[in-house]
Amino acid sequence: MQALRRGLVRPCLGSTSVVWEAAFWGFVGGFALLIGAVVGLVWRTPPRVIGLVMAFGAGVLISAVAFELTEEAFETSGGLPVVLGLGGGALTFFVGDWVLDHHGAKHRKRSGGQQAGGNPSAIVLGALLDGIPESVAIGVSLLRGGAVGVAVVAAVFLSNVPESMSAATGLRKAGHSRTWIMGLWLAVVVVSAAAAAAGYGLLGDAPPVTIAVTQAFAAGAVLTMLADTMMPEGFEHAGSTVGLVTCFGFITAFLLSHA
């Protein structure tokens, strides 16, 4: 693997532990949620633009899932841990998403105001469910070579902007205040940082097979989230063009991870 794929240069954090470094990069990835929310609340972004940006972010995340998580897990521990992790992550997200959908969080990422009839608590939990697997992936990436994977952080950052942009627009149309919406995403950012730290802290001394299962678990959850929310929303707003834009996002992340 090339140097860039192995990781980002560590920030100057003095004697701060690697766990705090993981939290820092989790915060960086999650901070994009605040950026997207501000854009969605301040500017009237055309739905087609939101759809295209979501498609690009989906392509970036698919690449990170394939090469930064799944491939590395397979290289270190073989096929069985990858299959178990992918299946477990996908099933966990599916069940959690299904439960939240039936308690008022079904349209939490939509931009058309469908959240009006939703349960605010379920919407918050749904946002956390979407963000935690990505953040855990950031923390776990630190376990490979001691530096966080640039493609993982970039993928999470680029995908989070359109996610929160779309959701913030919809939540505002549904009648939620700007303060409530920004508070929601701020909470998700904090939890994202904690999840990234936990991803490293809980697995720092774990055997390679455990790390591989965790990588694949995060990959399965993220992939299921993409297919369930981001990709359908992108297609709804931007039509068949999203296929090309998704491919471009995949290519961009692939080249970034192999630079």
PLM region spans:
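Intrinsically disordered, metal-sensing/regulatory segments
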Residues: 2-259
